[in-house]
Amino acid sequence: PEVLEDIKNLQNDYVIVPIDKAGKYFSFICKKFYIITLLNELQFPTGTSNTYKLNTSNADTIISSNVEFCAHLGYSIKDEDKTLPMVYWIPKMHKTPVGKRFIIASKHCSTKQLSKDVSKVFKLLYRQVRNFHDKSYFYSNYNKFWVVENSTPVLEKIQRTNLKSNAKSISTFDFATLYTKIPHQSLIDVLANIIDFSFSAGKKKFINVAGKNAYWTHNKNNSFSKQTLKLAVHFLISEFHFTLGNIVFTQTIGITM
């Protein structure tokens, strides 16, 4: 009990957050500095940010719109999920000077289940597109697919290169604003093309999500069609709202971390 009381006292003056890329460690950040950093990132109250715009609608109105859209796709939103995500940041201690990673997330959110299911669907489409290019590479010896789900393929490629002993140099690049600078319409158009390509490949015209996986099916009940998947993608990207305290913002370019 005494330890818990001491932690609560610390929280009066400090924000306790995990450290980026060091999840077992925590940082104690001055609460005033933490809030000022968030306001500066959002450029509030000046409203000069190209990425985040102040939304004049209240949170309840936006949540109701999210619930209505999800219901149109067959989702029933739990009361505990009828909220908007919030913005926070964690320090990048591996950077000099110390950097900041801004994150918009929440344990509960009105579009949480839809977003999770769309993510599972795109993992299915990813494997389909990857298999297509694997076959193309087999026949043409020309690789057009440069997307990886994790570091395993990269490590395997490095290992094969090391065995050949013919590598001259290796370079890595880090895009600090890779996700937050993608124009929404460009992203929506590219994903729509991937959806069109994937749905044209087989006879099954619906995708169902069950548990952790998505699969192709002939059954349209509780499934995504090509059109409803496009609608879901468009909505999740273009209607992304979050809060800082009781202030509502809309992300107008890029996607959240």
Task: Please report, for each region that a protein language model flagged, where it lies by residue.
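Conserved polymerase palm-domain catalytic core
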Residues: 157, 161-257
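Eukaryotic basic, amphipathic alpha-helical target segments in cytosolic regions
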Residues: 11, 46, 71-73, 98, ...
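Internal, charge-rich low-complexity segments
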Residues: 29, 34-36, 40, 124-138, ...
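Non-catalytic, polymerase-adjacent accessory regions of viral genome-replication enzymes
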Residues: 1-89, 95-100, 109
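Conserved pre-motif C helix in the palm subdomain of viral-like polymerases
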Residues: 84-131, 176-188, 227-243, 249-257
